Amino acid sequence: MEHYLRSVHNSPTLSMISAARGLSPAEVAHEHLKERGIYGLAPPPPPGTTPTEYCHQMAFLASHASPYGELLVQSAAAGNTSHLHDYLTPMDVSRFSSPRVTPRLSRKRALSISPLSDASIDLQTMIRTSPNSLVAYINNSRSSSAASGSYGHLSAGAISPAFSFPIHKPCSLSAALSQQRSLSSSFGHTPLLHPSPTFASRQQGALTSANPAPPSNNSSAPDSVLNKVSSESAVSSTVNQVIHKRSKVKTEEEADSVRFPQPPDHLTDLKEDLDKDECKQEPEHIYETNCHWDGCSKEFDTQDQLVHHINNDHIHGEKKEFVCRWQDCSREQKPFKAQYMLVVHMRRHTGEKPHKCTFEGCFKAYSRLENLKTHLRSHTGEKPYVCDHEGCNKAFSNASDRAKHQNRTHSNEKPYICKVPGCTKRYTDPSSLRKHVKTVHGPEAHVTKKHRNDIIQKPSLPKENGDNEASAKLSGREHSDSVSRDQEHCLQTRTIKTEDNMMHQSSPGGQSSCSSEPSPYGNTNNIDSGVDVSLAWQGSLGDLFGLEETSPVVDSTVSSWQRSGRPATPETQRIHSAETGTAEEREIKDNERFLLIYEPNATCQNTRLPTISANGFDVIGVPSSVLINPRAIELSMNDVTMMNQLNERRDSTSSTLSSAYTSRRSSGISPYFSSRRSSETSQFGGRLNNSSSADSYDPISTDASRRSSEASQHSGLPNLLNLTPAQHYRLKAKYAAATGGPPPTPLPNMDRIGLRNKLSLMDGADFPLPPFRQLPVPRRCSDGGGNAGLTPMYPHEIPGNNSRRASDPVRRTAGIDDKPLPRFSRFHSMNSMNTLHPPSLSERRNGGLQHYTCSDGGLHRHVYSPRPPSISENVAMEAISCDADVPGGDDDLMLPDDVVQYIRSQNREAPEQNLQTEYSSPARNLQSNTKSFHNNTPEQPRAPGAYLSRNFPALAECLGQTANMQDNNMPVQWNEVSSGTVDVSDLPKQQFAAGNLAVVQQKQNFAQYQSFNQAPMQRAHNIMGQGQESVQRNISVNGQRFNYLQQRQQQMSQCQIVSSDFIPQQRYSQSQSMLSSRAMQEGQSQISPSCNNMVERPGVHTHAAPSNTLNHQRLAVHGAPTQGFANNFSVNQDGLHPPNAYTVQPQKNGLEPQQNTLGMSGQAFNHGMIQPRPPAAPHPPNRPRNIHPVHHPPYMRSPHPVSELSPGQQTAEATPKRTSENTDPTPKDNNLLYYSGQIHMYEPNGNFGSGIDCTVRQLPTMPSPGANQVTSTVDSQGLEHPPVIDFDAMMDDGDHSSLMSGTLSPGLLQSFSQTSSRLTTPRNSLTLPSIPAGINNMAIGDMSSMLTTLAEESKFLNLMS
């Protein structure tokens, strides 16, 4: 005792408690006792304890410098000495269970006040204030919580060994403790223990163990007892069978004693709860070593042997019949539904408690895992069950306590009516009712399911933990014929929770406080698991989860279902019978609810907590995650309204489900955390995966995350996702009002749907969107779910606002803000503009796998209605579109009509292009691949090195290295490959062609080129000569393409697909070549001044006469194609800036573009890299964007700035405006990309003769897929075609290394980044490592990367289309 007092005195918990209450420990204890009414109680000394002894004990306690000493003295004076002694005298109470005494009545009512209760110490405060104190407090109450079986409840029923004290006259103490236990139960199991829960709980535990609580130790009691025990069984399993047996005995005794003093129902309930809890405590461990199985009398030396014997010989031996044949088993051989239930049940007989508390110094063990879990809450202080009553912050470790609390504290409702004829008792929680029935009416009078149904059945034998669990699972047990058993099962279902109830008691705030108080969800159908709350309850998901975790899954499941039916608290379970009675009173109305409780499928009707209606949806089958978001469930339940609600919530609603899941990414990086969208998307968090580019791309990808969320919104759930975008849109429109959002703008996606139909018309076939999305294809497009319209733009979404999420394409304020651009449905994603057309199968297989950047492609260059479709709409449509396998529709869906037409023509031409690209050289192959890549051949990896690796291992190797390096170096978007962009590293085939599409590739290409340039580039230069012929041919073709391309650009400014035939040199310059061939062919002058950044390598000046001739443009170099761009890549098509046109701004590249734009000639780029500069802003549609094709023959060389280009123009725009000037229809060239990004070509040697700010401008109208679409900043319609650099020509011209030399300038990347809110425009976010100055002039290479990016974008567009 002294030891105990010391521990108590020194108990941080006590200190904390006193501190919490502003009382000295003594005052705390005193006040606590006083509050508990202990002082008002003057029970005789414990039986067998002489007053002298009792006083001696108290004196002993008082003699110690313990707050309890004073309390004891005071209490002794008050005549409560015996009880105080009981409280203060730590005894192995767990070994003593005693009937509750009258004091318990007053205490019981007081007990309703949990430590968390007002009168009691605020355990939450304690816990939150001082975990240590809480832990200490819990440790003190640990045994009680554990012993009491009310996990986390202070009065666990037994004092932990650490707190056990030598018992003066244990017998008398046992009696005293019995009384004490009653008192403690009354007091919340530890009146003093609130100050020092440990003591009380332990005493209680000791009392419990000493005097098995008749009801509390019911697990050993008859089934009726066991029902309580069953609920208690969880704990009861903890409780020794012997104790249970004792409990049985004591239960009856206690029933009498309790019965005798029974105060108001609440007190009685509390008393019963305490008893129950105590019983739950799993009193003294039964240690059976002899087998009493029917016909078996084997004896064993150890319990383990017995258990082994029973399990192997009896249980497993009767595999198909799960019947306990133990002699005198209260179950009366009622079969269990599952073997494990029988196994658990047998623990009642054997006393096995395999689940031991792992906390140091805590020796609690439980037969049921859920009881252990509940118990552990006493250590952790976890109280997942928070009172649902507004303004009440009390939390409970179990649902039953919460239910008690809620019903008792916040209402006078006693829904649990005793169904025993002639009994009018009503209780606030099922455990109390159960306890009442057991104690007052006897173990046979258990409230059964039928009782609850107002059918009083012969109380089935109490379920044990296993039984309870089984019951819980069985809740309406297999043997409905044995109604009592069924009832019992029902109770036991709750009984399972009853153990949980025990557990709930064990919560620090719980047992006495919590247990006394119904768990917060108790109002709801409290199941200890708290699952009760799941459907019916408005409680948090955490409750469900916590409850489930707390209680066995079965319990949680059952209880959750039960909860739906009614609160399943420990009491609920135990009281299931009682609950049947009391709850029936209210639940008679709610018998269905009980059915729900027992029948998971039944929806709870009368849960106190707002039930989450499942639209007939049985939550049971729903994943907890789904359950978490009832809305999602409802959605899955086809509640379109839920969709609307989710949409309304968009961010928060959806996020409930998906935020944690689907929006995990979205919340990750994006400045605005796609969490919003992901929330939206999350709404349907059921989505199997976030198709969002975020998922597809870099997990970090900001933009992807949000969109991915959006995509994910629809991804998992078939309901919305099943809807076609149009359907989704309709739903959206229907619920626009509900969502509070403006009526969904006819989705561009809808338009796209229409478009798709149109495209289908174009294609001649309209492919219905699959009811479910195909596997969500990682896509920016998915991110581009067209819900942006509903969703307010985020700052980052605001055009020109760079703060926008990378995933959110933002119109660049520069040009776009200046002029109203056709509003893309969503700047956040390509799809926002237009629902992404599902990529073609090949695209999905390839591009989709490669996370084709749909985001830009998704942007249809339509003027969209002011309100773009909501994210959900777009997402759903997008997801559907993107995922749907629409033979012709995929591309169509992704692209605007013009784009689709363009793509179609391109696709038709693609073979031609491919053939063209396939002239003879690997470069052609690369081009072909690039083309095919752009031709919606996602299949062709974009990884810059992959294709090269195929053709040029060295290049590929360099590229691969660079890609990896640069992907790492790249901004997330780049890694993510800029929402629309595919990560280059992932794309092996489209090396450079994709480079521009994915700036990442560019970076990779550059870095690769940097290393690659030096050798492979030179080699490429060598090849270049070879390739040049091809290039020339290709250029010819490219010229044709370019012409066609121009047409397409005009037609499909949105689709910037640059394909070019690449010789290996061109490979690294593939994109560049493509761009150069086409862009330059298309309009060398189209190269925006940003292109001026491309430095012509002093050496051969390739001046392509700014003739529209494809060859000239194609060469974009003034020399023969054979003139390689090698060292003299003059790309000064009209787009070239003056030497200092722009300072290359290092993006995330290692390269630092020179602050001054590289001089046209002479200015050597220090980094020897081409770093595309992002255009300062997208040019206004009217802004002169590009040098007219081949207006300025001098490309790189010509130092003259292209005055016609505005600086912004000079700056490559991630999304170049389409220049109507360059409208020369070129043979469809998927490879043809328009790189609007400004590329700063830095000569590896830094020798670029002229710093050319080459803004390879994709046709402004046709930003590379990532560019405009991602950027969403540019209205392609109104934009001029940016000068296109003919990288093929450049490549042909020679210095590939110069082309390749260096990553796109950070500025270019930056412009990309600016332009491309998403990775779609890899250029924006792509940080290209600078290419060593020593590397060959890679201006083209950089252009190539740019072109590659553009190509990728084009490909992406193609994919989207």
Curated annotation (Swiss-Prot):
One cellular component (GO) term of this entry: nucleus
Keywords assigned by UniProt, alphabetized: DNA-binding, Metal-binding, Nucleus, Repeat, Transcription, Transcription regulation, Zinc, Zinc-finger
Compositionally biased region (Basic and acidic residues): 475-502, 573-584, 805-821
Species for this entry: Xenopus laevis
Protein name per the record: Zinc finger protein GLI4
InterPro entries the UniProt entry points to: GLI-like, Znf-C2H2_ZIC1-5/GLI1-3-like, Znf_C2H2_sf, Znf_C2H2_type
Transcription regulation among keywords: yes
Biased composition (Low complexity): 506-522, 653-670
Annotated spans, Disordered: 185-270, 434-527, 556-584, 647-720, 787-832, 906-946, 1134-1230
